[in-house]
Amino acid sequence: MKSAKKLLSVLCLGIFILTFTACDMVEKTPEAKAKSTIAKVNGEKIQRKDLDESPNMQQVLSQIKTQYGEEFEKTEQGKEVIKEQKKQILENLITEKVLLQKGKELKVIPKDEELNKEADKKVNEIKAVYNNDEKKFEETLKSTGFTKETLKEYLKDQIVIEKVINEVTKDVKVEDKDAQKYYNENQSMFTEKPNTMNVSHILVKTEDEAKKVKKRLDAKEDFAKVAKEVSQDTGSKEKGGLLGDISYSDSNYDPTFMKAAIALKSGEISNPVHTQWGYHIIKINSKKEYPVKKFDSVKEDIKKQLKQEKQQEAYTKKIEEWKKASKIKTYEKNLL
């Protein structure tokens, strides 16, 4: 099972991320179900087997079986969960189909000899994950529904998709001034060590409640005592509102909350801060801040990051444009 998950994980990295015929009373054979059309993209069919045999779908089914047991997918709840997952994966397959069609249009598909050579190289890279153990590799292929031939065909498609994406994003550039601007606006991200702050807060529903809390604190009432009385954050209330040490770059907290907290000095208490959770009164118990690295030492890393972000934006914009211009029809009734 671990080997299968490892292969699926490797294969799924290549996917950018990076649908009534006859009589319903007649149940289709497994072969007929596999060949049933779940989508058409500019006249080209996507069959159910394309979805069911995809690495993403295999990974989803593996996770569902591990988490909920072998019988879950047979239940009504399981069928609904799987159908929703299939709809998402079908959207990926539609995107891939559009990209493959554009590969022909843009003339970026390599000649057969070169494409086979690149695919063989990727196969060897996957084998290396298994220390070139041929038996283990073949067992894993079998457990994930692949043969050597279907794996190679899948990889050839991914190579073409990668070339289309490269074509779309080839003109993306980032100037030094862009990196300098990002550096100036995000200096807390480039310290010698991660900056941290020890934070407490009191969470209430309304602004009026928050103002009353702030008034009590301004009158020198104990923060922890007030938090235990009125805070609606059950996770920190009994600890006097203590959240503990938080890195300045922690993405688990609301960005508005983080911005307000970072702006405070040690010992300071904020005015009411509104987030999706309600109104916070934030207290900074202490801070550990470190020197900022010189711009020249982080410039190339910043440019690389910004380039990747711009490439993703360019790709997303282009694929949305292509899909909008395509004739796409899905057949969700054929997903299960």
From Swiss-Prot:
Signal peptide: 1-22
HAMAP family, sorted: Foldase_PrsA (MF_01145)
Entry function: Plays a major role in protein secretion by helping the post-translocational extracellular folding of several secreted proteins.
Lipidation (N-palmitoyl cysteine): C23
Name of this chain's protein: Foldase protein PrsA
Topology term for the membrane: Lipid-anchor
Gene responsible for this protein: prsA
Cellular component annotations (GO), alphabetically ordered: plasma membrane
Superkingdom of this protein's organism: Bacteria
One record GO biological process: protein folding
Location(s), subcellular: Cell membrane
Organism expressing this protein natively: Clostridium botulinum (strain Langeland / NCTC 10281 / Type F)
EC number: 5.2.1.8
PANTHER family found in the cross-reference section: FOLDASE PROTEIN PRSA, PEPTIDYLPROLYL ISOMERASE
NCBIfam families xrefs: PRK00059.1 (NF000809)
SUPFAM superfamilies: FKBP-like, Triger factor/SurA peptide-binding domain-like
Reactions catalysed, as given in the entry: [protein]-peptidylproline (omega=180) = [protein]-peptidylproline (omega=0)
Keywords annotated in UniProt: Cell membrane, Isomerase, Lipoprotein, Membrane, Palmitate, Rotamase, Signal
Lipid tethering residues (S-diacylglycerol cysteine): C23
GO terms, molecular function: peptidyl-prolyl cis-trans isomerase activity
